[in-house]
Amino acid sequence: MKIITDSGADLSFEDCQQIGVTMVPLKVEVDGVSYQAGVDIDTEHFYDLMDASPVMPITSTPSIGDFAEVYQKFADEGEEILSIHISSGLSGTFNVAKQAAEMVKNARIHLIDTLTLSAGQAWQVTAAAKMQQAGKSLDEIIAKLGQIQAATTTHFTLPDLKYLIAGGRISHLRGLLASMLGIKPVIEVSKE
């Protein structure tokens, strides 16, 4: 069995290699320069570039072809595939992976919508890899991922509100008032 994920898990390419997971990276464009998240730009560098750029970065999902190529490679090797992805409520990545899976006819692909991102997604990917290395069956791994999903709530705090304002998540006025009062929101990732 092969485990595949995307860079929404905040695992580097090297992290994935160490645990035997294949990563299909999301794409990020900052100031006209394109990067593959987790491959040629890490989270810290991304935030540094964001802080220095007057323009909001553009993120995009991997292409259907990116996933189909990886799926086809492992299908041709006779591998069953467990593909674990960033929440479908936060990104189109899961749906792109699903479309790619439907294109690869000779593959046995099991798609998991983690219902989260970042550390919550990384936890699921890492747990699946450890269970695989321990010789657990695919059914056992999928059941455990369901338990982890049920037990996981992902929260974030932000040092300031400028990205929420720029991204239209909160109004400029509310952002200005919250900033003046020193309010730093705690954001919970919804499982819906």
Question: Which residues does each predicted region cover?
Answer:
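Glycine-rich phosphate-binding loop signature in dinucleotide/nucleotide-binding domains
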Residues: 74-81
